[in-house]
Structure formats: structure tokens, C-alpha cells
Curated annotation (Swiss-Prot):
Species assigned in the record: Eremothecium gossypii (strain ATCC 10895 / CBS 109.51 / FGSC 9923 / NRRL Y-1056)
Subcellular localization: Preautophagosomal structure membrane
Gene label: ATG10
Disulfide feature: none
The protein's Enzyme Commission number: 2.3.2.-
GO biological process, one term: autophagy
Name of the protein described by the UniProt record: Ubiquitin-like-conjugating enzyme ATG10
Main location: membrane
Residues annotated as transmembrane: none
Assembly behavior: Forms homooligomers.
């Protein structure tokens, strides 16, 4: 479990790494809502995911939400993207069977409305990531981020080793 302060602090430390991630087209931290928002391209750059990471209000663990966009072939004059809702296990994700994913209505980014998102179940997060709060978000994104990029876990795991290597040189 993470406190809201730990969640915010760790996401802010993770943000520069996510912005260097080759598939991340946009990364934004909303301090008021304590929400991480990303736009991520698929492997073949043929579709996009809106990614939202919130702190689950009940479990106090990160919650991954996804929306899937594809280009609209009916419009050829300019690029238009359409929001698609398909079976969660038909999404172009890497090993989606590792996690329970379902469509759900969640509070909108702003206002009192609700939006439909794919939600990755948060129940087993501590069992998957471990309960230690140090580097929790880095470990979490190394695991759950693999849905979007199978190599992301290796990239972020290297960041865990780098501080140890730097300290040994001093």
C-alpha cells in the first residue's frame, strides 16, 4: 500500500524515465488529481493507448486504466482516431492474460461525468509488486507497463541498478 504522498513523489521520479520511453508520445502528471496520464503508441505504431494511473481509493495501490484508439480509415484527407471498445483480450497488449482486464465506468478526468476505460484489476497488486514502499512505482511500472511494451520492464529495471552502480563509484 502507498500513501498519496509516496505515490505522488514516486511518480514524479518516474516521469523522466517514462518521457524517454520510445513508445511514450505524451506524459503528464496532474498534481491536483494525483494522476499520471500517458499517450502510448503500439509496437507497429498502428494504434494508440491513453493510459491513466491513479491511486486506487480503497486498496491504496496504483490502478492502470487504458483506452484504445485506432485510425479511422473512412477519413483519408487527414488523420482521425476513433476510440474502440473490443474484448479486452483482443487488445494489442503483450501477455494480457497475466492480468484481469475489464471495461468499467470510472470518474472522468474533469467534471462529475463517467467515462468508459479498460481497467486492470488492482486486487493482487501488492502480491505482484511486493509491499515495500521504496521504489514501489518503478517496480509497479516495470511489471504492469509490460502490457504496453514487453521490454519496458527491462528498461525500468536498469534504472534500479544505476543508482547502486553510481554509489559504488563514489
Amino acid at each position: 500500500m502507498l500513501s498519496a504522498e509516496d505515490f505522488s513523489d514516486q511518480v514524479l521520479r518516474l516521469l523522466p524515465l517514462l518521457r524517454r520511453w520510445r513508445r511514450c508520445e505524451h506524459a503528464l502528471w496532474d498534481p491536483r488529481a494525483r494522476r499520471l496520464q500517458l499517450s502510448v503508441a503500439t509496437a507497429r505504431n498502428s494504434a494508440r493507448f491513453d493510459v491513466r494511473v491513479d491511486l486506487h481509493p480503497l486498496y491504496a495501490v496504483p490502478q492502470l486504466l487504458l483506452r484504445y484508439w485506432e485510425p479511422d480509415p473512412a477519413v483519408s484527407e487527414y488523420e482521425v482516431w476513433k476510440l474502440h471498445f473490443v474484448d479486452p483480450y483482443q487488445l494489442p497488449l503483450w501477455q494480457p492474460g497475466r492480468f484481469s482486464i475489464a471495461l468499467d465506468q470510472v470518474p472522468a478526468t474533469s467534471g462529475s461525468a463517467y467515462e468508459t476505460w479498460y481497467v486492470v484489476n488492482s486486487c493482487d497488486t501488492d502480491a505482484n509488486v511486493g509491499p515495500e514502499t521504496d521504489n514501489y512505482m518503478l517496480r509497479w511500472f516495470s511489471l504492469y507497463g509490460q502490457l504496453l511494451d514487453e521490454n519496458l520492464g527491462f528498461t525500468l529495471a536498469a534504472a534500479l541498478v544505476a543508482p547502486c552502480t553510481d554509489q559504488k563509484k563514489a
